[in-house]
Amino acid sequence: MAQKHEHDTSVITESAPKQKLKKPPLYKVLLHNDNYTTREFVVAVLKEVFHKSETDAVQIMLHVHYNGVGVAGVYTYDVAETKIQTVEAAAQENDMPLRLSMEPEEG
């Protein structure tokens, strides 16, 4: 709050004490394997929506294929939710049953 005295031309400002900002919690976006969604579609989604390189996208796709589930990326809640909705819409448009979920990142 600024205070000004009658014959004084200087202004004194008071600043609120700085609050430490907490980092928002992060969530893992998980891809789940199925027997119908093509490997090419999964790689394309990883590249286009999750901005993975070709190499990383293929590695993640293979991990999901052989292990049943894999992490596409780690994001804040809103970003994770948006990415899931984007992929689900693309999967539906392409008649793919690709399933995604998210869970809090531990640590």
From Swiss-Prot:
Region (Disordered) residue spans: 1-20
GO biological process, one term: proteolysis
Family membership: Belongs to the ClpS family.
Free-text function comment from the UniProt entry: Involved in the modulation of the specificity of the ClpAP-mediated ATP-dependent protein degradation.
Subunit details: Binds to the N-terminal domain of the chaperone ClpA.
Protein name listed in UniProt: ATP-dependent Clp protease adapter protein ClpS
Organism of derivation: Myxococcus xanthus (strain DK1622)
